[in-house]
């Protein structure tokens, strides 16, 4: 009987240990957007390991994330993540600090409501990020609004101030004026005391940009916009162009830009090929063309960008001077539909992904 009792005890212990092992393994897993290279129908939600924390990294429990053009390109195999970064989609996230890695400062604590620029990994339940890139979610802002800030607002801020060097009184031409970056850029131009003109693909999108502060808007589907831009600037042209289109807009951009203008190229939605008398026109107008991206920039550069943004722009979200523009939200399980919507150019502003579908749980861990 004693032997039977011992065997039963051992069996129960084995069962308990096995259950604990399964539970521990499960605790280290998370849901995340996964994909097979191709169309938006190839996106799905799968179980993957939670990210491990490195030196000075914070683990965010993600409430909301968002999608960007870069995500759709990565899904197609055209824009891989930088070396060493997560291959999970998502360049921004909002949530709470779940844990802190070795070497973190005392600036952040577990439970803090934060948003962050990411190099990848945002479309998941947890994401690791350098603590230097964390930003506090402004008072009174929910997670959906917060997820619409990091990638597009920091991109627009970089384009205008770190690269384009926009000055008070200048005029900026913003292509894709109703996109996430576009709606942020329009507001940032006004904040800088400059004037913006936008292009967009519908009157409704132009109306949105104008409501945010754009002085004029032109429908690129209705012919050459460059003469309209010249008319709007009394023949001078614009001082700065924020160009996400590239090749197909070259001639019109060249006509619309002022002498000594700064042309900031950050996307190639219209292709990367141009032909003809390219350099002579640039020389005649003394135009400077700068290509730029943000995702592959160094941590030092991104940290400086985040620090400047927090000082110069973040307070204006609290005052209501600027605001993130949300088009719609999708649950993580419907991320394929979100990609499809973006690729059909249906959105004005941001498409947000809800990982936790209860926007009232602001402090839940």
Protein language model features and the residues they cover:
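NAD(P)H dinucleotide-binding glycine-rich loop of Rossmann-like/cofactor-binding domains
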Residues: 73, 84, 113-176
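C-terminal capping/lid region of NAD(P)-dependent oxidoreductase domains
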Residues: 28, 319-328, 336-365
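Mid-domain Rossmann-like dinucleotide-binding core that forms the NAD(H)/NADP(H) cofactor-binding site
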Residues: 147-223
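Cleavable N-terminal signal peptides of Sec/SRP-targeted secreted and luminal proteins
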Residues: 7-23
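Glycine-rich beta-strand-centered segment in the early N-terminal region that forms part
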Residues: 49-67, 78-121, 365
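Short amphipathic alpha-helix with an adjacent loop that forms part of the alpha/beta core around
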Residues: 225-235
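Glycine-rich phosphate-binding loop and adjacent beta-alpha segment
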Residues: 203, 248-321, 354-365
């Amino acid at each position: 009987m004693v032997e039977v009792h011992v065997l039963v005890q051992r069996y129960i212990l084995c069962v308990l240990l096995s259950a604990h092992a399964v539970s521990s393994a499960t605790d280290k897993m998370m849901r995340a957007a996964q994909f097979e290279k191709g169309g938006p129908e190839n996106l799905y939600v799968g179980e993957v390991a939670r990210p491990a924390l490195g030196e000075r990294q914070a683990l965010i429990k993600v409430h909301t994330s968002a999608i960007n053009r870069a995500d759709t390109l990565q899904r197609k195999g055209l824009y891989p993540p930088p070396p060493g970064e997560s291959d999970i989609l998502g360049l921004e996230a909002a949530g709470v600090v779940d844990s802190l890695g070795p070497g973190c400062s005392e600036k952040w604590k577990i439970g803090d409501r934060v948003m962050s620029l990411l190099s990848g990994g945002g479309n998941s339940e947890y994401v690791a990020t350098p603590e230097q890139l964390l930003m506090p979610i402004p008072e009174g802002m929910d997670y959906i609004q917060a997820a619409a800030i990091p990638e597009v607002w920091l991109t627009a801020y970089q384009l205008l101030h770190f690269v384009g060097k926009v000055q008070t009184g200048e005029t900026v031409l913003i292509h894709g004026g109703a996109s996430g970056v576009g709606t942020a850029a329009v507001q940032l131009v006004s904040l800088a005391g400059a004037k913006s003109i936008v292009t967009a693909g519908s009157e409704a999108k132009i109306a949105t940009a104008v409501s945010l502060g754009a002085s004029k808007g032109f429908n690129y589907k209705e012919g050459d916009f460059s003469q309209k831009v010249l008319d709007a600037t009394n023949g001078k042209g614009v001082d700065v162009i924020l160009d996400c289109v590239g090749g197909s807009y070259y001639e019109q951009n060249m006509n619309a830009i002022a002498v000594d203008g700064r042309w900031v190229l950050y996307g190639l939605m219209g292709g990367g090929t141009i032909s003809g008398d390219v350099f002579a026109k640039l020389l005649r107008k003394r135009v400077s063309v700068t290509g730029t991206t943000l995702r592959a920039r160094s941590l030092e550069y991104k940290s400086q960008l985040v620090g400047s943004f927090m000082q110069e722009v973040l307070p204006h979200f609290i005052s209501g001077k600027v605001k993130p523009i949300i088009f719609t939200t999708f649950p993580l399980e419907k991320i394929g539909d979100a990609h499809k919507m973006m690729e059909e150019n249906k959105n004005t502003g941001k498409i947000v992904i809800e990982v936790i579908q209860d926007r009232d749980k602001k402090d839940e861990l």
